[in-house]
């Protein structure tokens, strides 16, 4: 257990959690807040095997910073997104904690920005985050969508617990977990995000979301692709654009006893998907 004592802690990088770690705060008195983001263009090409980048202007960047590198893929025009940490510096050139594994060529207009989740879980299990306040400092940060970040972000994990957490003001999602199984979110308050309040991400099995309050988000609870055998129960959704959204291959979920109030565009939305006979949201009970 890592106990976070009362205070405001300003983050220049994510807190990366490991197996069997419990983060225990002091409620509203323990606040992790993201520092303002800085964005700059890259000044030189970097190939997929490189572990360095060169910035046009390194003002606002320090060794230890979490960064998000983005560009257009030079081969197919798609989006390239890479999350790394700056670990060494020589002038405007920085070494990264790991190789790029994708090409960042000037033809794709690559940029670096100090964007990251506040608490980050990747390939871990049996993690708990409890009784803490997370502030994304939305007014001073660029958007980074919930496939990559949030106040809490998890990727390829299992058996996570988020309990009595206030997640607020992220320019993206509040809590997002991608291909994560048996995630429990209880008695949390996720509000005032540009993106989603709770985002059980693609392929996530058996999420339990119970007793949460979701306010003034783009969507309160968003079932991404292929979320199955989940429970969303006794949650309060207030003044979101959409209260609850469910769609592509989201099957066998129970959505029970939720209050969905004053939604701006829709209370509960079943997203249409006509690309295949099994692509719709089937056998869900509301």
Language-model features and meaning:
Residues 7, 13, 19-21, 29, ...:
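The right-handed parallel beta-helix/beta-solenoid scaffold, focusing on the short coil/turn
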Residues 1-22, 26-38, 69-85, 98-109, ...:
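N-terminal extracellular ligand-recognition/capping segment immediately after the signal peptide
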Residues 3, 10, 16, 24, ...:
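Extracellular beta-strand solenoid repeats
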């Amino acid at each position: 257990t890592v106990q976070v004592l009362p205070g405001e802690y300003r983050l220049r990088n994510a807190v990366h959690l490991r197996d069997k770690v419990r983060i225990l705060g002091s409620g509203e008195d323990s606040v992790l807040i993201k520092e303002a983001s800085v964005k700059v263009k890259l000044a030189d090409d970097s190939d997929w095997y490189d572990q360095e980048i060169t910035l046009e202007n390194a003002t606002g960047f320090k060794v230890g910073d979490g960064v998000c590198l983005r560009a257009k893929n030079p081969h197919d025009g798609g989006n390239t997104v890479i999350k790394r940490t700056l670990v060494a510096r020589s002038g405007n050139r920085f070494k990264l904690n790991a190789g790029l594994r994708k090409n960042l060529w000037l033809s794709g207009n690559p940029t670096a920005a100090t964007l990251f989740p506040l608490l980050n879980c990747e390939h871990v299990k049996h993690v708990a985050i409890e009784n803490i306040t997370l502030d994304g400092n939305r007014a001073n940060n660029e958007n980074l969508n919930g496939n990559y970040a949030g106040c809490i972000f998890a990727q390829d994990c299992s058996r996570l617990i988020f309990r009595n957490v206030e997640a607020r003001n992220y320019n993206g999602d509040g809590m997002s977990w991608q291909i994560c199984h048996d995630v429990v979110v209880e008695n949390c308050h996720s509000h005032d995000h540009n993106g989603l309040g709770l985002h059980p991400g693609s392929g996530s099995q058996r999420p339990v979301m119970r007793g949460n309050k979701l306010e003034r988000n783009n969507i309160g609870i968003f079932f991404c692709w292929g979320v199955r055998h989940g429970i969303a129960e006794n949650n309060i959704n207030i003044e979101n654009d959409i209260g609850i959204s469910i769609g592509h291959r989201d099957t066998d979920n129970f959505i029970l006893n939720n209050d969905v109030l004053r939604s701006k565009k829709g209370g509960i939305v079943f997203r249409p998907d006509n690309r295949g006979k099994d692509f719709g949201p089937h056998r869900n009970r509301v």
